[in-house]
Each structure stands twice: as C-alpha cells, then as structure tokens.
Amino acid sequence: MLSQPSRERAFVLALGLVVSSSLAAAAPCDIYSSGGTPCVAAHSTTRALYSAYSGPLYQVKRGSDGATTNIAPRSAGGVANAAAQDTFCASMTCLITVIYDQSGRGNHLTQAPPGGFKGPEANGYDNLASAIGAPVTLNGQKAYGVFISPGTGYRNNAASGTAIGDAAEGMYAVLDGTHYNGGCCFDYGNAETSSLDTGNGHMEAIYFGTNTVWGSGSGSGPWIMADLENGLFSGSSPANNAGDPSVSYRFLTAAIKGGPNRWAIRGANAASGSLATYYSGARPNASGYNPMSKEGAIILGIGGDNSNGAQGTFYEGVMTSGYPSDATENAVQADIVAANYAVTSLTSGPALTVGSAISLRATTSCCTTRYLAHTGSTINTQVVSSASATTLKQQATWTVRTGLANSGCFSFESKDTPGSFIRHSNFALVLNGNDGTKQFKEDATFCPQAGLNGQGSSIRSWSFPTRYFRHYSNVLYAASNGGVHTFDAAGSFNDDVSWVISSGFA
C-alpha cells in the first residue's frame, strides 16, 4: 500500500498528465472531480469550467428594450463568445442579469434581494453589474468579467448540494487583485439562506479587500480572508495572521476550504506561478466556529446579510463538495495559469491624447450649442462659442490626463483650475481638488467609448461602469440607464450621454 506522501505524489502526477494533455481536458471542475471533490457550483462569465460544457455562461439585458440573450462559450470548454455580447449590446447599455451555474445543479446567481441591509435598486434589491466593466482576454480571446461596484451583488438563497452545517467544502475565485476597498464585504461563497446575519459560523466565503473591522493579515492589505460571519478571519486568531500576506496581483487566485475543525487559505498570481498556503489549521479561536453552521446559500460581491459597501472584480469561481487536496488545487491553479488571463483595452471610439485640451459638446437635439463646463464646483452645460468670454472658454476646456485610478482610462483636469478634476460624488459630477486619496482617484477616472447614439463618445465611470456623463436639466451626473434616481430616466438617455469632443476653446 502506498504511503500518504506517495499517494499524494501519484495524484499530482496523474493530474499533471491531465493538465498537460490539453487545456480543454483540464478544466477546473474536471480536475476537482478527478480529485474526489466535485463542483456543486461553477460560475464564470469568461470561460467554461468543464471541458465538455457548451451551455450558457451568463445572461445580459439591454437597457433600450429589456431584451435578454445568453452568452455561451465559443466552443465546448472554451472562452466566452464576447462578440455575441458586443453585437447584441451595440450602441446600447447592457447589464449582467444571470451568472449561470455550469455544474448542472441550477445554482445560478441573480440580482441579490434585500436582507439585513437594503440595496440601492427598487424594492431594496442590489444593482446589477455592467456587462462591459471588466474586459479581459484569455489566450488572446476577449471576454468580460463581473465588475462589482458598491451596491452591486448576486445571490442564490436556494442552492442545491452546497455544504450545510459542518460539512466540508472548498472554493476558489479568480479576481482582480487591484480592485478592492475596505467596505463589507466582497465575498464569493457560502452564506445564509435568509439574507440575514444568523450568527457566528453561518458562512464560509472567500473575502478580498482591506477591511480591518475584524481580522487582518500582514502589511496594509488587500488580503484574502474567510468571511465566516461576524468575522473576517486570516487564521486561528480572530485578530491577525502575519502569515497572510498583502496580495495585489492583477489576476489573483483566492482559495478557501473548510471542514470539521480545519480550514485553509491559499492564494497565487493567477497569471503565473503556484499556490501558496497562507493558513492551514484549526478553526478560529472564538465561539461559534467549531462546529460550523453553514447554511448553503451562494453570494457574490456582498456579505451574508447583504452588506453591499464593497467592490471587486470576479472572473470565475467554483464551490465543491468535500475538502479538496492541495494537489487538486495546485492542478486547478495550473489550469488557470494556462488560461492566460491578460488585460485589454477599456476604451473605444474616438481616441483621446493625454495632455491635450478638449471641449465636449452635447448631442441631444435641444442642446447642441451647449458644452460641458463648470461654475465653481458644479459641473454643468453652458452655451459656448468662439465669441464667448475667455473666462467661459476656460471653464469649458479640460486637459486630458492619464486615469488617476487606472492608466487604461482618463481623468479630466480643469483648464482654469489646475489640480482640480471632474469626479462623481453621490453620482453628481463635481469639480474638486485632487487630494491624492484612493477614493478620489477612483471617482475621477472615466473610460470613453463610442457614443451610444452614434455620435462622438460616451464617457462611463471606471468605478461605476453602469454610469455615464449625462446632462440633465443642464447639470451633469454620473447616470445609469433607467436607474432609481430622477437623473437616471431612460428617456433620451443615449443622446444625453453622447458628446462630440473637439479641441479645447482655451
């Protein structure tokens, strides 16, 4: 009989042969199944997680007419057909309405309902994610991830086959390690079926961010931790595990697994390298976590009680039945690396040149002589022409800068107030001085795309990609198509968010 180390080595070899034979033969859920811990939920908007899977990955909904379509892999086991989305959503806004479960259990993720906390949408539901907020490529093929802004969340409170009570499970997610905050809580995993906080140990989910209300790791974060309810844990201590490092890989693999009085945190660069173990040992030294009382719902982007103040980006993830071996997880990581996640352009339409001075003209039929300008800190539209006073020309001129939060997009500095930039604040656009904070940089970063009405450019917020520069009663907002605010009204939306960009007046 083989010893335990020998069995482990044999399993690694077997999985290695699967991985090396072909990418399609080594999809993550095939690997977990070979390891004896099959997927009970498999979610991805970027690719199939089974080699034979050819069903829908996700559904998108158009803002113009409410029509929906499903996006499937290009071929069985392959990358999502982003071109089908681009065609369906051309010159329109689109939201991700369903993230389908590929496991066959029907554990699909949909718009999260209200719970202990209400969401910002109608009837307390959370927002849905933009379909274009997180473009990437996998082996050179374009796909879209799920960009979670604060207030956005997905959930399934009636999941099938997920771990209940103290039963063992594993999970991983591929995330954007540069997109996070300190809000509660950017999670993926097992949560309460009531959307309420029902006590310690009633969750087991991957958390990623810089929240320090409960636990923390080394450095200043962000960290991979486990949300076990009423605590984000980095190890056995409720307070800190110095072995849990700050990690900010552009593509990050985060893994959590837990069983009776044991659990582990693992992480890696999803683009290269191997998983490292940040914690492996007993359950936290606090009441309610041994045994666990997991309930089996599935969440994405939110906490178990619908806490929805966090942000992050999700590309793929699964949940398993049983406690996966390190060898199984290592083989999954090898497959993730082989998928070759890479960044791609966040912008489209007429090109902008960093350092240039521009003016932006409205295209709505009422307002084609009006340009984006400011009066003090208020961003508005004003009638401007070559005959206008120099002061007004300067107020309607903006210097293009590299995006303060993401170099793939842009920030717009006031010509007449150097050091001040357009930002969104409570979804109004305002002119504020750059205070150098992470929050300011994110609020002041915008990504142009081809104009939704066929003219010029539409300029969406990087941090809230459902929201665009919109003039409404001559005042500027970061508006979504048909959202809950007055300035989100669907009427004339595509016209109101389309701007013709020209050389600056000043």
Curated annotation (Swiss-Prot):
Residues 1-26 form the signal peptide. The record marks 184-185 as: Cis-peptide bond. GO terms for biological process: arabinan catabolic process; arabinose metabolic process; L-arabinose metabolic process; pectin catabolic process; xylan catabolic process. Glycans are attached at residue 285. Keywords: Carbohydrate metabolism, Disulfide bond, Glycoprotein, Glycosidase, Hydrolase, Polysaccharide degradation, Secreted, Signal, Xylan degradation. It is found in: Secreted. Residues 344-506 are annotated as: ABD. One of its GO terms (molecular function) is alpha-L-arabinofuranosidase activity. Residues 27-343 are annotated as: Catalytic. Substrate binds at residues 227, 230, 304, 424, 426-427, 443, 471, 476, 496. GO terms for cellular component: extracellular region. The active site is at residues 229, 305. SUPFAM superfamilies: AbfB domain (SSF110221), Concanavalin A-like lectins/glucanases (SSF49899). Disulfide bonds join 29-39, 89-94, 184-185, 409-447. It catalyses: Hydrolysis of terminal non-reducing alpha-L-arabinofuranoside residues in alpha-L-arabinosides. Its EC number is 3.2.1.55. Alpha-L-arabinofuranosidase involved in the degradation of arabinoxylan, a major component of plant hemicellulose. Able to hydrolyze 1,5-, 1,3- and 1,2-alpha-linkages not only in L-arabinofuranosyl oligosaccharides, but also in polysaccharides containing terminal non-reducing L-arabinofuranoses in side chains, like L-arabinan, arabinogalactan and arabinoxylan. PANTHER family: ALPHA-L-ARABINOFURANOSIDASE B (PTHR39447:SF2). Belongs to the glycosyl hydrolase 54 family. Organized into two domains: an N-terminal catalytic domain and a C-terminal arabinose-binding domain (ABD). This is Probable alpha-L-arabinofuranosidase B. It comes from Aspergillus clavatus (strain ATCC 1007 / CBS 513.65 / DSM 816 / NCTC 3887 / NRRL 1 / QM 1276 / 107).
